[in-house]
């Protein structure tokens, strides 16, 4: 990857294009954006370094420029490495390969995440007591009939129980 170094004129151009930085610089020492060309290099750097906002804006502008330039260099080896480290998920967004959960076909009970084996993985295809317990709980939950009226009634009771507290807090604040 190339090393990018800004000239003072490029920094001034970035500042001139960013109205928020212009306002910030104008407030500092009663300067106006056109006066930036008259500033000595050290003064300009001091103004920029003393402003977190100016620094973040310049970093953002530099990142945009760098990304644009990298995007134009398709034959760049670094880009090929980056592309090989990404895969496209179901939503068509790039995801690093390290975050893929891997299930080995030979033994589905072994699962890795970022290359580390996960110990607590339940294989629902295997018949044993812990899996049966999990299946039983899942079945009970799926068969349970959640009555909306009962839920609303419970919420209303909870609210009514808290009303005196809310009322007394309001009285105290007046």
From Swiss-Prot:
Q: Key word Lyase present in the record?
A: no
One Pfam family from the record = Phage_Gp17
Task: Check the record and name the InterPro entries matching this protein.
Answer: Phage_Gp17
Q: Name one GO biological process term.
A: viral DNA genome replication
UniProt keyword list: DNA replication, Early protein, Viral DNA replication
Its assembly, as annotated, is:
Homodimer. Interacts with the histone-like protein p6; this interaction optimizes the binding of protein p6 at the viral DNA ends, thus favoring the initiation of replication.
Q: Outline what the protein does.
A: Involved in the replication of viral DNA. It is required at the very beginning of the virus amplification, conditions in which a low number of viral DNA molecules enter the host cell, possibly to recruit the limiting amount of initiation factors at the replication origins. Once the infection process is established and the other replication proteins reach optimal concentration, it becomes dispensable. Optimizes the binding of protein p6 at the viral DNA ends, thus favoring the initiation of replication.
Family under the similarity heading: Belongs to the phi29likevirus protein p56 family.
- The protein's name is DNA replication protein 17
Organism name: Bacillus phage PZA
């Amino acid at each position: 990857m190339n090393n990018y170094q800004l000239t003072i004129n490029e920094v001034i151009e970035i500042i001139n294009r960013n109205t928020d930085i212009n306002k910030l610089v104008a407030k500092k020492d009663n300067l106006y954006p056109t006066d930036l060309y008259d500033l000595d290099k050290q003064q300009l750097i001091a103004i920029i370094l003393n402003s977190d906002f100016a620094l973040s804006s310049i970093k953002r502008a530099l990142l945009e420029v760098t990304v644009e330039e990298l995007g134009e260099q398709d034959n760049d080896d670094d880009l090929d490495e980056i592309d090989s480290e990404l895969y496209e998920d179901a939503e068509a967004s790039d995801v690093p390969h390290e975050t893929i959960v891997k299930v080995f076909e030979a033994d589905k009970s072994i699962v890795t995440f970022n290359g580390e084996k996960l110990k607590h993985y339940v294989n629902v295809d295997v018949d044993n007591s812990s899996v049966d317990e999990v299946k039983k709980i899942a079945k009970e939950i799926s068969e349970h009939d959640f009555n909306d009226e009962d839920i609303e009634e419970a919420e209303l009771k909870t609210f009514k129980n808290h009303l005196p507290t809310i009322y007394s807090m309001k009285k105290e604040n007046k």
